[in-house]
UniProtKB/Swiss-Prot annotation:
GO cellular component assignments: ribonucleoprotein complex; ribosome
The organism of origin for this protein: Shewanella halifaxensis (strain HAW-EB4)
Gene3D superfamilies given in the database record: Ribosomal protein S10 domain (3.30.70.600)
Keyword Membrane carried by entry: no
The protein, known as: Small ribosomal subunit protein uS10
Family membership noted in the UniProt record: Belongs to the universal ribosomal protein uS10 family.
Subunit structure: Part of the 30S ribosomal subunit.
Protein task: Involved in the binding of tRNA to the ribosomes.
Keywords, in A-Z order: Ribonucleoprotein, Ribosomal protein
GO terms for MF: structural constituent of ribosome; tRNA binding
Pfam families: Ribosomal_S10 (PF00338)
Cited PROSITE patterns: RIBOSOMAL_S10
GO annotation, biological process: translation
Ribonucleoprotein is among the record's keywords: yes
Length: 103
């Protein structure tokens, strides 16, 4: 796998789970002899929702909620066959969305 690069993007609502998952990925890649760049924190997306608490009147009474989506990026440069095999067997947390691209 010469001149290859694996780019892994992680998304989730809990930043502790994402940091734990990136640490597992980096440790696995370094253990198999690959060079790792990252984890790089990407901008956090904040979605805010405003909801009227009263069903009829009192427009001033509102609740506000926020949903934060945290993202991390990990690049694995020049991965070996062992690296790809170890990453495929890696079991990550359920609250983390993982996107893998080869480049």
């Amino acid at each position: 796998m010469q001149n290859q690069r694996i780019r892994i993007r992680l998304k989730g609502f809990d930043h502790r789970l994402i940091d734990q998952s990136t640490a597992e990925i980096v440790e696995t890649a370094k253990r198999t002899g690959a060079q790792v760049r990252g984890p790089i924190p990407l901008p956090t997306r904040k979605e805010r929702f405003t909801i009227l608490t009263s069903p009829h009147v009192n427009k001033d009474a509102r609740d506000q909620y926020e949903l934060r989506t945290h993202k991390r990026l990990v690049d694995i440069v020049e991965p070996t066959e062992k690296t790809v095999d170890a990453l495929m067997r890696l079991d990550l947390a359920a609250g983390v969305d993982v996107q893998i691209s080869l480049g």
